[in-house]
């Protein structure tokens, strides 16, 4: 995802964080797949705060976005792992995103 000024969020974080190598690999994959013009693909970018410690559970209430984090009233980009599953299942059952990245948050 991108910052408000269009930079990749991953490039703005401290590079010694444990998840940086995997996050950069997914960014590289997105850069490759977005050049694909024949395949109908969708690329899901998880919320910046998405992990099992978020105990909201499954709400089914989320908002969608594309290149920028979906922020709540307090400026957080958060989604429970249960609602990530709902977002992806909803997209599979009723595709709304074609050849584009999408994300979700509360």
What residue ranges belong to the model's regions?
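Oxidoreductase cofactor-interface core, primarily capturing Rossmann-like NAD(P)-dependent enzymes
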Residues: 1-106
């Amino acid at each position: 995802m991108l910052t408000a000024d269009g930079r990749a969020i991953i490039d703005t974080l401290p590079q010694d964080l444990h998840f940086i190598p995997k996050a950069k690999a997914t960014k590289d994959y997105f850069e490759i797949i977005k050049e694909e013009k024949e395949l109908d693909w969708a690329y899901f970018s998880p919320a910046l705060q998405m992990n099992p410690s978020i105990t909201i559970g499954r709400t089914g209430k989320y908002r969608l976005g594309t290149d920028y984090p979906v922020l709540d009233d307090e400026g957080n980009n958060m989604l429970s792992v249960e609602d990530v599953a709902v977002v992806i299942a909803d997209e599979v059952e009723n595709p709304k995103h074609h050849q584009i990245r999408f994300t979700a948050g509360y």
